[in-house]
Amino acid sequence: MSSSITAPEGIINPPIDELLEATDSKYSLVIYAAKRARQINAYYSQLGEGLLEYVGPLVDTHVHEKPLSIALREINAGLLTSEPVEGPAQ
């Protein structure tokens, strides 16, 4: 008997090593992915209201896929760029 269970996405796929190539550190990756996940979540929230302030997912998504998983796949696909933010001059 075969099953049609798909491979899990998100934290295990894409691999962390590939994701770290897009940023300077694990901390930067966490902040980067969290900000994008918030944008995706806000996009879905605003769909019903007709207000589209944020850009929707840049990759194909599944019905029950979480915003963080979508953000990690976008980062891995190279669809987003991360620019370092410089602190205030002292």
Curated annotation (Swiss-Prot):
Q: Which UniProt keywords apply?
A: DNA-directed RNA polymerase, Nucleotidyltransferase, Transcription, Transferase
- Gene symbol? rpoZ
Q: Name the source's superkingdom.
A: Bacteria
Instruction: Return the EC number.
Output: 2.7.7.6
Q: Which family does it belong to?
A: Belongs to the RNA polymerase subunit omega family.
Biological process GO annotation list? DNA-templated transcription
Q: Spell out the molecular function terms from Gene Ontology.
A: DNA binding; DNA-directed RNA polymerase activity
Biological function: Promotes RNA polymerase assembly. Latches the N- and C-terminal regions of the beta' subunit thereby facilitating its interaction with the beta and alpha subunits.
Which reactions appear under catalytic activity for this entry?
Answer: RNA(n) + a ribonucleoside 5'-triphosphate = RNA(n+1) + diphosphate
Its quaternary organisation is: The RNAP catalytic core consists of 2 alpha, 1 beta, 1 beta' and 1 omega subunit. When a sigma factor is associated with the core the holoenzyme is formed, which can initiate transcription.
- Name under which the protein is recorded: DNA-directed RNA polymerase subunit omega
GO cellular-component terms in the record? DNA-directed RNA polymerase complex
